[in-house]
């Protein structure tokens, strides 16, 4: 297979971690007989510095023509001026819109060897392996908003809307993923209070009954789900939910493995290139120090192979290699915790994954 991959290193530690993921992909191409053509483009703060735009047109054009996109991170205190005309994060929002990316996939997987890094007891969190599907382009974040009145009478509002089509496409995508895992799907809503959630629940149930009768399906209210993630996270597999609920629940769930440095994500649409990235930020305080954890970005590259390029065996090879270096006891400082004698650098961790792929 010959595929074009756009790299968007971005700001802070972005260039360091994207480079390690690129080296892993080079090894995958060598091992499995593929050709990956990489091109690097600007996004975020560095793009503002160079062009005045957090997402320059050449970056948009390159992304549209690529098979997939791998992003590092954007933002940092350098660009936090509230009076600035634009911010680095605007580039990320714009690229999602330009590419029509409506589904955010976030796997929450705990490696058994890292159970002691979780804030929860090992017996509660062990075995956690959840894949969240969050709807990205509808819901309250994109509803009509405004204010009226003044003083004590000042009022603000934000409307929450979902269409049948928006619900159908995200539920279908999640159900397809469930078929490739344990055949279980949980939909999260607030149908006891919110009208859009009632539509969500009705449409989701129709899709599951008519198109995925083989998938075990249940529904959970969002407040109950917030509790379940703390007291029994290992009981869930694939979870689908709306924009705001997904935003909150995935941030909560991201704490389960104990480090953001282990968690990748993907943003997908109907065909076209997907966008893959670690969930952590640009961490400017450690940029250039070779201590950033590249594993989330490497795992994002595995997601890219699976979801955009259809290379399941290759994705599994990367995931197996990452599991292998963790089993071997290699830890970047965020994972080593108090025992820094176990810690390795960004480059050493990346090289260890490459070595596993070569063996």
UniProtKB/Swiss-Prot annotation:
Xref: Pfam families: Iso_dh
Where is it mainly found?
Answer: cytoplasm
One Gene Ontology biological process: L-leucine biosynthetic process
Residues binding substrate? 96, 106, 134, 223
For this chain, one GO molecular function annotation is: magnesium ion binding
* Record EC number: 1.1.1.85
The cross-references to InterPro entries, in alphabetical order and at most eight, read: IsoCit/isopropylmalate_DH_CS, IsoPropMal-DH-like_dom, Isopropylmalate_DH
Report the subcellular localization.
Answer: Cytoplasm
| Sites where the protein binds Mg(2+) | 223, 247, 251
**A cellular-component GO term for this protein:** cytosol
User: What does the record's cofactor remark say about binding?
Assistant: Binds 1 Mg(2+) or Mn(2+) ion per subunit.
Q: Which cofactors are required for activity?
A: Mg(2+); Mn(2+)
List the Gene3D superfamilies. Isopropylmalate Dehydrogenase (3.40.718.10)
Question: What reaction(s) does this enzyme catalyze?
Answer: (2R,3S)-3-isopropylmalate + NAD(+) = 4-methyl-2-oxopentanoate + CO2 + NADH
- Which UniProt keywords are present, listed alphabetically? Amino-acid biosynthesis, Branched-chain amino acid biosynthesis, Cytoplasm, Leucine biosynthesis, Magnesium, Manganese, Metal-binding, NAD, Oxidoreductase
The pathway noted for it is: Amino-acid biosynthesis; L-leucine biosynthesis; L-leucine from 3-methyl-2-oxobutanoate: step 3/4
Q: EC top class, in one word?
A: oxidoreductase
Where is NAD(+) bound in this sequence?
76-89, 281-293
Question: Which chain positions carry the site (Important for catalysis)?
Answer: 141, 190
| Quaternary structure note | Homodimer.
State the protein's purpose. Answer: Catalyzes the oxidation of 3-carboxy-2-hydroxy-4-methylpentanoate (3-isopropylmalate) to 3-carboxy-4-methyl-2-oxopentanoate. The product decarboxylates to 4-methyl-2 oxopentanoate.
The text of the family note is: Belongs to the isocitrate and isopropylmalate dehydrogenases family. LeuB type 1 subfamily.
Under the heading NCBIfam families, the entry gives: leuB (TIGR00169)
Protein name from the UniProt record: 3-isopropylmalate dehydrogenase
Organism taxonomic ancestry = Bacteria, Pseudomonadati, Planctomycetota, Planctomycetia, Pirellulales
Gene for this chain:
leuB
């Amino acid at each position: 297979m010959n595929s074009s991959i756009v790299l968007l290193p971005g700001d802070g530690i972005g260039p360091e971690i994207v480079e390690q993921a690129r080296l892993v992909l080079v090894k995958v191409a060598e091992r499995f007989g593929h050709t990956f053509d990489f091109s690097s483009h600007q996004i975020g703060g560095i793009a503002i510095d160079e062009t005045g735009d957090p997402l320059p047109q050449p970056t948009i054009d390159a992304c549209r023509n690529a098979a997939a996109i791998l992003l590092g991170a954007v933002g940092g205190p350098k660009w936090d001026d509230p009076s600035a005309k634009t911010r680095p994060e605007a580039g990320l929002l714009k690229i999602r819109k330009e590419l029509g990316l409506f589904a955010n996939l976030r796997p929450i997987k705990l490696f058994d060897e890292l159970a002691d890094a979780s804030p929860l007891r090992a017996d509660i969190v062990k075995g956690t392996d959840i894949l969240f599907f969050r709807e990205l382009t509808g819901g309250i974040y994109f509803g009509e908003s405004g204010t009226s009145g003044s003083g004590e009478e000042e009022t603000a509002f934000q409307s929450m809307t979902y269409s049948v089509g928006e619900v159908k496409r995200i539920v279908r995508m999640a159900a397809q993923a469930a078929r490739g895992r344990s055949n279980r799907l949980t939909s999260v809503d607030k149908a006891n209070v919110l009208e859009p959630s009632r539509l969500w629940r009705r449409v989701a149930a129709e899709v599951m009954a008519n198109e995925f009768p083989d998938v075990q399906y249940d529904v959970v209210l969002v407040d109950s789900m917030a509790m379940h993630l703390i007291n029994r996270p290992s009981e869930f597999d694939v979870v689908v939910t709306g924009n705001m609920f997904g935003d909150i629940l995935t941030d909560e769930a991201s704490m389960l493995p104990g480090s953001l440095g282990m968690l990748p994500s993907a943003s997908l649409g109907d065909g076209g290139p997907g966008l893959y990235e670690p969930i952590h930020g640009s961490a400017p305080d450690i940029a250039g120090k070779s201590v950033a954890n590249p594993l989330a970005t490497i795992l994002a590259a595995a997601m890219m192979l699976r979801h955009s390029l259809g290379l399941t065996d290759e994705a599994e090879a990367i995931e197996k290699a990452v599991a292998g270096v963790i089993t071997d006891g290699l830890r970047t400082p965020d994972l080593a915790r108090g025992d820094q004698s176990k810690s390795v650098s960004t480059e050493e961790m990346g090289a260890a994954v490459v070595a596993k792929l070569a063996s």
